[in-house]
Amino acid sequence: MDFSELSVECLLTKLVELGFDQTREERSCKYTDRDFVQLGCQRVLGSFQSGRDFLQHQHEVEQTKIARSTFFKALQSSRRLQVCEDVSRGILKVLNEQMDTLEVDYLKQFSALNEYEVYAGDGHFIEHACHTKLIDSKKEQRRTGKLPKLHAAGLIYMQNLRNGLLSLFAPVSDGTRKNHEMPIFRNHYEKFKAQTNKRVIYVLDRAYVDKVWWSRKMGPNVDFISRSKSNFSLTMCGDMGFDDNKEINQGVKRDFLAGLGGNSAAFRFIDYKDPETGNTYQFYTSNMDLEPGLIAWLYFKRWTIEKTYDTSKNSLCEQKAWATGEGALQVQAHFICVVYNILRFINEITLKSMDEDEKISYRKKYADWIKKREEKAIKKGRSINLLLKNSLRMPKIAIQFIRFLKNNFHSPLPLRRLLPILRLRLINYVVF
């Protein structure tokens, strides 16, 4: 199906319809599940200050009257949560196939990664819902030794580093309690892993260090990449050979195996010195096959998910939980994933439609930035990592691009007719 022949609103409607093919939880209600998902995505696109603001807009502008209690009870419904999870996964499946059709693969130059799915993962925290209540103070004081307080609401997301599509991994906290991310990751790992048959590499920060658990999970189908902690006690097991003449291994100083403390499993450690800044890093991983420089590069590409969080928080204005409870927080997260993935898909369609001159203009700003960095490094007697110039870069979705799609959500024009303006929004920053 050619999605570019649909308007933005019809594209969302069609993808939601395809997503519902993946769920068995849909029921016939006055406030239908399809309306719930559709309106939830529209709220993400609308930059509303609150749920009441959104409902008033629906009533006065869209001529759709929804009772406040109906909307907020739907957000907290466990059945509707399952519907949203199934639909989000179904839409993700459709968009993965569409990305393959568009030949979107930001890791394609690294043939060693062809057999892997590579995910960047991290926690993302926003303000808790305004009606979030403190949990029982005496019980919590006995548990932690201090009086309870409200915290940020947070979730763990995973982003596919091949095509940029985002998916919810697990909730961390609705704000009533501060939780560490690694126990949450351990509890939901098997469920997420079951979604793919390929080998998986998780690129995670140091919040996900757990030498005992990872040593049990080390195997042919799953690997992780992270950074070492300063308190690691290493038991040397021997060096691994690598070719320091390869471009990919620029900056690698050492590649070796070591045990952690009393753990019998040996992990791979890579000492890396950034040729541009001189900063040193030590990465550790369970993968024994990839070039050490590629391990380091994948960790640096983890920053992609931080740019995605910036898009969610500042471009889509999703800075606060919609309702109390982890269930409502997950529903909101699924809506954010659906909207972000559709924006990413339209972004790739727009890039694909550019002619050569437009592609050169689009890449010029990044090329000029890299050139300035290179000149600055040369003055200091250093150099930049060649992969900065020679590898594919997953762009952050431009704010003017998102604003244009928001403003034209109800436009009857097909996406194909909007592409000329969308290309301009990517190439030039227009001052209004």
What would you call each of these model-derived segments?
Residues 1-22, 27-30, 241-272, 314, ...:
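A short, flexible helix-boundary coil/loop motif
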Residues 1-52, 62, 85, 89-102, ...:
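Dynamic "connector" segments at or just before major functional cores
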Residues 39, 54, 66-72, 116-126, ...:
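Short, conserved catalytic/metal-binding motifs centered on acidic residues
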Residues 75-161:
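Active-site-proximal, Lys/Arg-enriched surface segment
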Residues 169-279:
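An internal, acidic/charged active-site-proximal segment
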Residues 274, 278-305:
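A conserved active-site cap/scaffold subdomain adjacent to cofactor or substrate pockets
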Residues 295-323:
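Short amphipathic alpha-helical "interface-anchor" segments enriched in bulky aromatics
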Residues 323-348:
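Basic, amphipathic alpha-helical segments enriched in Lys/Arg and hydrophobic/aromatic residues
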